Structure formats: C-alpha cells, structure tokens
A protein has these predicted regions:
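Active-site and adjacent substrate-binding regions of carbohydrate-active enzymes
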Residues: 1-218
Length: 218
C-alpha cells in the first residue's frame, strides 16, 4: 500500500518495520555527529497508524476521510518515541522539541517529564482555544484576547506540574498573532510590543515564527 498523510509526493514511513526505524536512527545520529544541538520533530504523532484498515466514512467533499481517524488515537506510539530518545537523543544530550498536538494532562509527564520522550513540546492548547469547528486552521479574527489569555494561564499551571513547554503565538499553520488578536485600528508599536512581551514572560521556551520579530501581519 501507499499512504501519505500530507503531500502525495511525501510517503509516510512504516515505523512498524524495524529496518526502517534503524535507518531513521542512523540518519538522526549522522546529523548529531555533524554538530547539531537538537531537532524540532514535526508531526510526530502521525508515525503510529491503525493498521486494521477498517472502512472510514468520507467526511470531505473529495469523498475521502480525514487521515487523523487512523492516527489520532493509536496506542503504542510511546514505544517508538522512547526508543528514538534512547538511541539518538540521550547519547548527545540533544534538545528535542516535539510537535505533539492534543496531549492530555494525564499523559503530559510521558512527553516532557523527567524521563519524557522530548525536552519539550509546543504549547498548542492556547492556540486552539479559539479555533472554529474541527479544522485547526479555521479561525475568525480579530479574536477576544482574554480567551487566549485565560487558556494560556490555565495551560501554564498544568504544564508546570510536568516540565516546560515551547510557547508560541503563531506558526506556519496558523494566522499571525498580530492579525488574530489586534484590531486593525490598534495595530502599532505598543500593541505589537505587548504581544511580544507576553511570550517572553511566560514560563517555558519562547519560539518566534519568521517575521514575528518585526510584528508581521497576515
């Protein structure tokens, strides 16, 4: 079979195959040997699949079903992540930042705890508090800032029990924070500076998306 979660030119790798995993680990370690300090690990929750191949009800205009129906709630991904950590990251004391969305509070220590899979993961919960519908890229703007603020405070309290997260306001999948939170008539140096101050004053590791450092809008 041929499976692609993203572009059709970008096949998913079969992590159930030990030989495939070994090749992945070889490549990671090769880059670490070149002097890299760590990795941002993209879409990592997609590596484990439901391979029962049950028929899925189409949920899109193209007659296909969302791929997350076979990747969203699959047990056993932790075995792969811990193996990769022990084989590739621990020996180099590497910094690892996982793109792991919708990690529930009860399993958060497995991801960022003292013996977690990663050094940290991105703090997506506040960013998804204001999304519209099931599509994580579907937003209305400008958004009431207090909703994001309250969700951020709540998330900070939860995360502090387990470790720390990589804090973001925007990325390549989401609107610019300046456009999302700041009404057009209030757009300027002081409002943009206030938005930037927040991410640097949160507990955790601040991440800036390209253009955010100059207050870029959509």
């Amino acid at each position: 079979f041929y499976l692609h979660s993203f572009a059709k030119e970008q096949p998913d790798l079969n992590w159930e195959n030990e030989t495939v995993r070994e090749k992945i680990y070889e490549m990671i370690c090769w880059w670490m040997d070149q002097g890299l300090s760590g990795f941002r690990i993209d879409a990592i929750m997609n590596i484990k699949k439901d391979l029962t191949w049950s028929d899925l009800k189409p949920d899109g205009p193209d007659g296909l079903a969302d791929v997350y129906k076979i990747t969203g709630k699959v047990e056993g991904i932790g075995d792969f992540l811990m193996e990769m950590k022990h084989r590739c990251f621990e020996p180099y004391e590497a910094l690892t930042v996982g793109e792991a969305m919708f990690v529930k509070e009860d399993i958060l220590p497995r991801f960022i705890g003292e013996d977690g899979y990663f050094s940290t993961i991105f703090a997506f919960e506040p960013c998804h508090a204001y999304r519209k519908g099931k599509n994580y890229m579907n937003y209305d703007w400008p958004q009431p800032f207090d909703e994001w603020r309250e969700e951020t405070f709540h998330n900070q309290e939860i995360v502090a029990k387990a470790g720390f997260e990589a804090n973001i306001i925007e990325n390549h999948d989401q609107p610019r924070g300046a456009s999302l939170f700041i009404p057009e008539e209030d757009y300027g140096f002081y409002s943009l500076s206030a938005l930037a101050t927040i991410i640097f004053c949160e507990r955790g590791l601040p991440f800036l998306y390209q253009g955010q450092e100059i207050g870029m809008s959509n």
